[in-house]
UniProtKB/Swiss-Prot annotation:
SUPFAM superfamilies: Small protein B (SmpB). The lineage of its organism: Bacteria, Pseudomonadati, Pseudomonadota, Alphaproteobacteria, Rickettsiales. CDD domains: SmpB. The gene is smpB. One of its GO terms (biological process) is trans-translation. This is SsrA-binding protein.
Amino acid sequence: MTEYKKVIAQNKKALFNYFIEERLEAGIVLKGSEVQSLRQGKASIEESHAADTGHEVFLYNCHIAEYEKANRFNHSTRRPRKLLLHTKEIKKIIGRIRIKGYTLVALSMYFNKKNKVKVELGIAKGKKLHDKRESIKEKDWKRDQSRLIRQK
């Protein structure tokens, strides 16, 4: 059975630049104008990442556009946003990202079936240049395979 997800934003660049070793789902603390802007699909997580500050995890550099109909109560577009995780998950994440070379990257942002905004995070390790070339070759080979299958 598949879950309902209305995807708001995806970080395709992260899948190219990192090896994703583990995926997690986290809630996010938002203001009302941010939620309204997300409902219109005005968000970008291309350059966003998450980091720990003691016993909490925050999402940095996530751009949520200002909501036009909100007056003076509008939000800052790139403010750090707190991620909602269980304490056990936070400790596990902190342990993993303290290892050299690992980072916590936002992969996608979506509404779940209860209309709550969720962020899919990935514990990732950066790819080297030759790894990126290999992934491009694999992608091209899969595309060529599908073309050959369609021609037959």
